[in-house]
Amino acid sequence: MKQIIYLDNAATTKTRPEVVDAMLPYFTEFYGNPSSVYDFSAEPKKAIAHARETIAGALGAKPNEIYFTNGGTESDNWALIATAEAYQNKGNHIITTKIEHHAILHTCEYLENRGFSVTYLDVDEYGVVKLDELKKAIRPETILISVMFANNEIGTVQPIKEIGEIADKNGILFHTDAVQAFGHVPINVDECHIDMLSSSAHKLNG
């Protein structure tokens, strides 16, 4: 096979050998259901708890705030749909941007078909959200703001802390799709006022 120079790591990454080595025992030896009560479940249960603590530490979060899904798309779907359903008695308005991943945009379309209102913000020539436009888009019935941390096509990093502060000041939940950012730039969910964050291991050699 000829040598390949792979330049699409923003789409997915090669799993690092040490990750394969770390995971292999749970495919071949400690494969018990971690939610079960028998002894065979103890080792995978311990591994999941350790992974949860590690991820929480990397985000400045608490271990009980970390949930595992099958990937970034499910995480995005869950964040938006669960928030919309849980807060629909408070409001039905969601703010996002026109340059989000399809996992966000398609979910917003789904919610619009269910009666929710979605504002899609424009960005400037560099792909950055205009904070003044964000502030203008907020309504009394706004329940969620969802803005990706870093864009998967052009690499723009959004002013997440400032967006989080605006959301927090207005009592609005803030979600960020950080699939392209986690593991590459420092993230502290408390400092950035992030209520929900999506990430995915396959973007960082996992």
Regions found by a protein language model. Give the residues of each.
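Pyridoxal 5′-phosphate
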Residues: 1-206
